[in-house]
C-alpha cells in the first residue's frame, strides 16, 4: 500500500468515528433527560469504573492505556454535554458577565493604592506606571496589602508576582490561597538594581550588603564577586536603602533602584548589578471585587483538583480544546495537606470570546474548586 492508501483508510475510519461520536452524544442527551426526570446526578462513578474495567479487558494489550485515556475523555465530554443540556448551575460565567457589564469603560487615573515597602519601592514604581495620580498607602508585608483591600482601606493593591530572572514570588502565590481579591490589571516593570551606599563610600569599604531576597537572587552573579561580604535579607529593597541611609555606616550597602539613591541621599557604587540586563518583574493590581475593563485578554484562575491520575490533564485538554492559550501554570501546596496542590492558571483569551465562559463553566463541573481571580489586560 502507498501512503495515500493508508491516509484514505484513516479518513474513512475518522468519518465513521465522527458519526459514532455524534450518535453517542445524542444518546447522552437522552440520558440527561432521564436523569433530570428521575433527579439523578450527572456523574455516576460506579458506572464509569465498571466501563473502564471492561475497556481494559477488551482492548489489545499494547493499547490498553491509550484506550482508557480515550474513553476517560469521552466520559468527560459526555458529562459536560449533559450538564449544558440540564442547565446545571455555573457561577463563574455569570460572575464574568456581570463584571464586564458593571465595570466603567476607563481604568481610573487616581485611587488609594496599597504597596508593600517604603518610599521608592519597586511596587510604588509599578503603581506609578498604572495610575497617574495615586495616593500610596505603604504596607510592611504582602499579607497586609491583601488585608488593606479586604478591609476597605484602599481601592487597589500592587503585588509582585514573577521576575524574569528569579522566577515566581512564592510568598504572594501562597497568600492568594488565603485572601479574597480580584486581579484587575497587571504591569511589567523593568528592574535595574544598583549598589547604593553613603556618599564618599568606596566598593572596597563594603562588608555587608542588604536587600530583599528576590533582588539578591537577581544579582547573584555580582555577589559572587564579593566573597568576603555578608549578605543580609530584609523585607524590601527601598527599606534596605533607607536602612543604609539611617545607619551612618560606610561598610554597609543596599541593592535597590537609583530612585532610592535620590530619595535617601545615597550614591551608586555600581549600576545594573543584576544578572540579566533585560530584568523584568510582573506586578498585579488587585481589588476587592471583579473589575473587567475593555480590552481584557488575560484571565487568572486558582484551581483545586482531585488527587487522582488525569485530573490536571482533563483541565489542560479543555483549555486546548477551546483553542485558549495557557501562558502560566504554577502549582502550590495546600496548607495542612501533604499531597494536594492548587494550580494557578493564566489564560490568554478575550473576555468577549464565547469560548472563555464555556471553559469556565466546564471547569466548575470537573474540578473540586475553581476560584476566578479576574480578567484584565497587561501594561508593558
Model-derived features: where do they sit?
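Domain-level signature for soluble enzymes in the chorismate/prephenate branch of the shikimate pathway
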Residues: 1-380
Amino acid at each position: 500500500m502507498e501512503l495515500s492508501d493508508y491516509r484514505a483508510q484513516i479518513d474513512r475510519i475518522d468519518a465513521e468515528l465522527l458519526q459514532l461520536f455524534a450518535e453517542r452524544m445524542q444518546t447522552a442527551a437522552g440520558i440527561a433527560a432521564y436523569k433530570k426526570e428521575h433527579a439523578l446526578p450527572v456523574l455516576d462513578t460506579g458506572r464509569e469504573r465498571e466501563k473502564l474495567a471492561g475497556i481494559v479487558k477488551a482492548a489489545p494489550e499494547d493499547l490498553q492505556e491509550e484506550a482508557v485515556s480515550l474513553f476517560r475523555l469521552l466520559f468527560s465530554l459526555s458529562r459536560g454535554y449533559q450538564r449544558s443540556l440540564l442547565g446545571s448551575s455555573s457561577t463563574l460565567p455569570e460572575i464574568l458577565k456581570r463584571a464586564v457589564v458593571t465595570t466603567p469603560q476607563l481604568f481610573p487615573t487616581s485611587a488609594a493604592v496599597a504597596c508593600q515597602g517604603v518610599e521608592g519601592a519597586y511596587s510604588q514604581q509599578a503603581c506609578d506606571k498604572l495610575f497617574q495620580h495615586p495616593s500610596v498607602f505603604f504596607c510592611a508585608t504582602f499579607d497586609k496589602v491583601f488585608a488593606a483591600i479586604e478591609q476597605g482601606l484602599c481601592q487597589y493593591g500592587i503585588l509582585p508576582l514573577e521576575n524574569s530572572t528569579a522566577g515566581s514570588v512564592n510568598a504572594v502565590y501562597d497568600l492568594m490561597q488565603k485572601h479574597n481579591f480580584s486581579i484587575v490589571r497587571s504591569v511589567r516593570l523593568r528592574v535595574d538594581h544598583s549598589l547604593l551606599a553613603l556618599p564618599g563610600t568606596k566598593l572596597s569599604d563594603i562588608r555587608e550588603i542588604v536587600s530583599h531576597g528576590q533582588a539578591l537572587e537577581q544579582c547573584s552573579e555580582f555577589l559572587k564577586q564579593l566573597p568576603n561580604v555578608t549578605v543580609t535579607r530584609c523585607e524590601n529593597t527601598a527599606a534596605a536603602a533607607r536602612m543604609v541611609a539611617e545607619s551612618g555606616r560606610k561598610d554597609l550597602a543596599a541593592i535597590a533602584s537609583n530612585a532610592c539613591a535620590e530619595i535617601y541621599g545615597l550614591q551608586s557604587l555600581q549600576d545594573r548589578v543584576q544578572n540579566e540586563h533585560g530584568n523584568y518583574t510582573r506586578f498585579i493590581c488587585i481589588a476587592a471585587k471583579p473589575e473587567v475593563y475593555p480590552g481584557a485578554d488575560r484571565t487568572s484562575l486558582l484551581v483545586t483538583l482531585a488527587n487522582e491520575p488525569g485530573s490536571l490533564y482533563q483541565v489542560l485538554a479543555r483549555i486546548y480544546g477551546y483553542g485558549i492559550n495557557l501562558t502560566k501554570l504554577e502549582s502550590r501546596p495546600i496548607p495542612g495537606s501533604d499531597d494536594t496542590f492548587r494550580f494557578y492558571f493564566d489564560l490568554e483569551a478575550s473576555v468577549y470570546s464565547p469560548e472563555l465562559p464555556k471553559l469556565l463553566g466546564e471547569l466548575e463541573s470537573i474540578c473540586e474548586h475553581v476560584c476566578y481571580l479576574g480578567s484584565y489586560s497587561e501594561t508593558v
